[in-house]
Amino acid sequence: MKVIFMQDVKGRGKLGQVKDVPNGYAQNYLIKQGLAKEANKGNLNTLKRVEANEKAEYEAQKAAAQEIKKQLEADETVVELKAKAGSDSRLFGSISSKKIIEGLDKQFGIKLDKHKLELREPIKVLGYTNVPVKLFKGVESKVRVHVTQEN
């Protein structure tokens, strides 16, 4: 019997996959547990529609990420932050991902999740720093951060 997997089933199939499985296994386990549906015309058409919607959503998210990348890579996009520092240019404290994200939002209206920034450790010195950003699968950029001394 052909079934459409509604969830990943270890050793049998993955979500959205159409496979031939033994009739008893399909009827008595997969379908009863809600792990799969029978692969009839209606269910196959539904699967195609769902896949098309997911692909369109994926493309829309990727396009949005490309747009944000274009904004981040513009020359005028430099996040200006102020912090107290000593005479040796070392900060009293540090600049975290959260502060960079807040600066991006306030100064440029770019909203990002702080987990997209790949800041290995907080910024602890004055000056310019390039912070890598992973916007989407295969879409990466850098945010330029300029830390100046607070009076």
From Swiss-Prot:
UniProt keyword rRNA-binding present: yes
Short name of any one Pfam family annotated for the protein: Ribosomal_L9_N
InterPro entries reported for this sequence: Ribosomal_bL9, Ribosomal_bL9/RNase_H1_N, Ribosomal_bL9_bac/chp, Ribosomal_bL9_C, Ribosomal_bL9_C_sf, Ribosomal_bL9_N, Ribosomal_bL9_N_sf
Domain of life: Bacteria
Stored SUPFAM superfamilies: L9 N-domain-like, Ribosomal protein L9 C-domain
Keyword Disulfide bond: no
Transmembrane segments: none
GO MF terms, alphabetically ordered: rRNA binding; structural constituent of ribosome
GO biological process assignments: translation
Any one of the GO CC terms: ribonucleoprotein complex
Keywords, ordered alphabetically: Ribonucleoprotein, Ribosomal protein, RNA-binding, rRNA-binding
Family under the similarity heading: Belongs to the bacterial ribosomal protein bL9 family.
Role, per record: Binds to the 23S rRNA.
HAMAP family linked: Ribosomal_bL9 (MF_00503)
Full protein name: Large ribosomal subunit protein bL9
Species this protein is from: Lactobacillus delbrueckii subsp. bulgaricus (strain ATCC 11842 / DSM 20081 / BCRC 10696 / JCM 1002 / NBRC 13953 / NCIMB 11778 / NCTC 12712 / WDCM 00102 / Lb 14)
